[in-house]
């Protein structure tokens, strides 16, 4: 029988852990952790995602703020906003909600965020740390969420053959690097891959992060261990006459062909938010490392 990997349930467990750590940090060091989200433009979907992040932050006792900017803001002005936040000692985590308008260079924006406050893990410094296997950088939230789901439900990842579909800088590449850190054998597939099903059918685990509605079907699976669906698309439901969220995989056609599967919604999405807040806590600890480390040393005497 197929097990549904409940991302909402696991995310709530992680949020409780983060909440407890936040309380301990505040009680012991009087540190109130704060996340700032920069939203450029009036994308309705982006606003929904941002409001959800703020609501989750509030629920666990983390301060948060949304900075809304005009869609046609000059790139240099956006960079200036980031500079101010980098210098603000009350801010511990900074993210710029994607997508950005086409006139803004996203890579330049990621690089401008202080790597210690880069809780999306997209600054080149953090990406570099991830790829060399260092443990002191911030890792992209979706990649962390996927690994946590797999470790919670599947447990041992060592030696597993994982096919990652998608080579984006946001999910595909960092997730592949993190899987390698867990001693997986990783195959990366993309739009130029010939005979995708040949790769997916022989994998232990398939992870798709493409954003193409229901493009994976029963022909792509054959008794696989797990399928993690990162993709999110809106489609029109002919039965309900309403828009609904679906993933990259056709859930009903796939679910009986794998042992573990994530739903959309309710799978990877909640885990991404949980790890955004966990990363913000980690960022605060990195920023205040000297204070925390010195205090720990006192207790060793």
Swiss-Prot record:
Gene3D superfamilies: Leucine Dehydrogenase, chain A, domain 1, NAD(P)-binding Rossmann-like Domain
Pathway involvement of the protein, from the record: One-carbon metabolism; tetrahydrofolate interconversion
Residues that, per the record, bind NADP(+): 166-168, 191, 232
Single GO MF annotation: methenyltetrahydrofolate cyclohydrolase activity
PROSITE patterns referenced in this protein's UniProt entry, alphabetically: THF_DHG_CYH_1, THF_DHG_CYH_2
GO cellular component, one term: cytosol
Domain of life: Bacteria
Name of the featured protein: Bifunctional protein FolD
EC number, as in UniProt: 1.5.1.5, 3.5.4.9
InterPro entries linked: Aminoacid_DH-like_N_sf, NAD(P)-bd_dom_sf, THF_DH/CycHdrlase, THF_DH/CycHdrlase_cat_dom, THF_DH/CycHdrlase_CS, THF_DH/CycHdrlase_NAD-bd_dom
Cross-referenced CDD domains: NAD_bind_m-THF_DH_Cyclohyd
Role: Catalyzes the oxidation of 5,10-methylenetetrahydrofolate to 5,10-methenyltetrahydrofolate and then the hydrolysis of 5,10-methenyltetrahydrofolate to 10-formyltetrahydrofolate.
Keyword set, alphabetical order: Amino-acid biosynthesis, Histidine biosynthesis, Hydrolase, Methionine biosynthesis, Multifunctional enzyme, NADP, One-carbon metabolism, Oxidoreductase, Purine biosynthesis
Catalytic reaction(s) noted: (6R)-5,10-methylene-5,6,7,8-tetrahydrofolate + NADP(+) = (6R)-5,10-methenyltetrahydrofolate + NADPH; (6R)-5,10-methenyltetrahydrofolate + H2O = (6R)-10-formyltetrahydrofolate + H(+)
Family: Belongs to the tetrahydrofolate dehydrogenase/cyclohydrolase family.
Subunit structure, as described in the record: Homodimer.
One BP term from GO: methionine biosynthetic process
A family per Pfam: THF_DHG_CYH
SUPFAM superfamilies: Aminoacid dehydrogenase-like, N-terminal domain, NAD(P)-binding Rossmann-fold domains
HAMAP family for this protein: THF_DHG_CYH
């Amino acid at each position: 029988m197929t097990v549904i990997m409940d991302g909402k349930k696991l995310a709530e467990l992680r949020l409780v852990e983060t909440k407890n750590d936040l309380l301990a940090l505040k009680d012991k060091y009087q540190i109130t952790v704060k996340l700032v989200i920069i939203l450029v433009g009036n994308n309705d979907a982006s606003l929904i995602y941002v409001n959800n992040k703020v609501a989750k932050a509030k629920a666990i006792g983390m301060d948060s703020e949304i900075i809304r900017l005009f869609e046609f803001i000059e790139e240099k002005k956006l960079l200036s906003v980031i500079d101010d936040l980098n210098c603000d000692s009350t801010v511990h985590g900074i993210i710029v909600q994607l997508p950005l308008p086409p006139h803004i260079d996203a890579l330049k924006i990621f690089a401008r965020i202080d790597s210690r406050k880069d809780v999306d893990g997209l600054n080149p410094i953090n990406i570099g740390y991830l790829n060399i296997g260092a443990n002191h950088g911030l890792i992209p939230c979706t990649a962390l969420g996927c690994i946590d789901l797999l470790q919670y439900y599947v447990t041992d990842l060592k030696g597993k053959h994982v096919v990652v579909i998608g080579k984006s800088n946001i999910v595909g590449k960092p997730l592949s690097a993190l899987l390698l850190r867990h001693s997986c054998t990783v195959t990366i597939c993309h739009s130029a891959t010939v005979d995708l099903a040949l790769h997916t059918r022989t994998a232990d685990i398939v992870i798709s992060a493409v954003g193409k509605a229901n493009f994976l079907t029963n022909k792509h699976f054959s008794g696989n261990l797990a399928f993690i669906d990162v993709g999110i698309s809106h489609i029109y439901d002919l039965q309900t006459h309403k828009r609904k969220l679906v993933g990259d995989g056709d859930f009903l056609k796939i679910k009986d062909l794998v042992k573990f599967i994530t739903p959309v919604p309710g799978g990877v999405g909640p885990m991404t938010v949980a790890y955004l807040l966990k990363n913000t806590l980690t960022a605060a600890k990195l920023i205040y490392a000297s204070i925390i480390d010195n205090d720990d040393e006192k207790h060793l005497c």
